[in-house]
């Protein structure tokens, strides 16, 4: 799978390599650093990788920063020569901000076990707390939600193409900000005025813009294991992204726990192909 390898190894050697590169923060995401909000998803992924190296010392893992469109097309052509034909930019790739975590199976193949992304959209809470009005005339409490978050669908679709021969789909997306509130709540401005964030407001909420990636299944759940659904006379295997949404920032510990659960689900599903002895 083409793409730059950031970390690679097994057991203690992998842990030491990550510590040397990133310091001790990622190593403590299940402890002292669990409540931090300032660790990037790249650092959280590195911390999850150290935990995997600790729990599965005989398995070799690697973290890639990207997956090229060329590699995706090669995989598609291996399924059917009619697929994977269109490529205009040789260097085209997807680069999930949490990277692509893989494990080497007993046949020497690298298998994707975790892909993570973290997106923020909607700064209304921060603006209200600061007493800043928004809009062109600077007379509104809220800014109409944008559509930037919809770009995540491209990465999800590309990874689906790459993993059509797998029984798992370990794509995790953490969405945060006022555009992803799952319940209504109140925020007080510095002047004492109380503003209500309404979670089902069409002006603010953008969760419905992303649930196509999860076939509108419930949010905040691990959907790593694919499901087979009967539609008419056809059976379809669905690859469903695991979407985690809330208005407040996700802590490093919350992201790490969800990502570790997805990675371990992947390892369980492909266990027969792994050499853990």
Swiss-Prot record:
<dbReference type="Pfam" id="PF02963">
    <property type="entry name" value="EcoRI"/>
</dbReference>
<keyword id="KW-0255">Endonuclease</keyword>
<keyword id="KW-0680">Restriction system</keyword>
<keyword id="KW-0540">Nuclease</keyword>
<comment type="subunit">
    <text>Homodimer.</text>
</comment>
<dbReference type="GO" id="GO:0009036">
    <property type="term" value="F:type II site-specific deoxyribonuclease activity"/>
</dbReference>
<keyword id="KW-0460">Magnesium</keyword>
<dbReference type="GO" id="GO:0003677">
    <property type="term" value="F:DNA binding"/>
</dbReference>
<dbReference type="InterPro" id="IPR011335">
    <property type="entry name" value="Restrct_endonuc-II-like"/>
</dbReference>
<protein>
    <recommendedName>
        <fullName>Type II restriction enzyme RsrI</fullName>
        <ecNumber>3.1.21.4</ecNumber>
    </recommendedName>
</protein>
<keyword id="KW-0378">Hydrolase</keyword>
<dbReference type="InterPro" id="IPR004221">
    <property type="entry name" value="Restrct_endonuc_II_EcoRI"/>
</dbReference>
<dbReference type="GO" id="GO:0009307">
    <property type="term" value="P:DNA restriction-modification system"/>
</dbReference>
<dbReference type="InterPro" id="IPR018131">
    <property type="entry name" value="Restrct_endonuc_II_EcoRI_Pbac"/>
</dbReference>
<dbReference type="InterPro" id="IPR011336">
    <property type="entry name" value="Restrct_endonuc_II_EcoRI/MunI"/>
</dbReference>
<dbReference type="GO" id="GO:0000287">
    <property type="term" value="F:magnesium ion binding"/>
</dbReference>
<comment type="similarity">
    <text>Belongs to the EcoRI type II restriction endonuclease family.</text>
</comment>
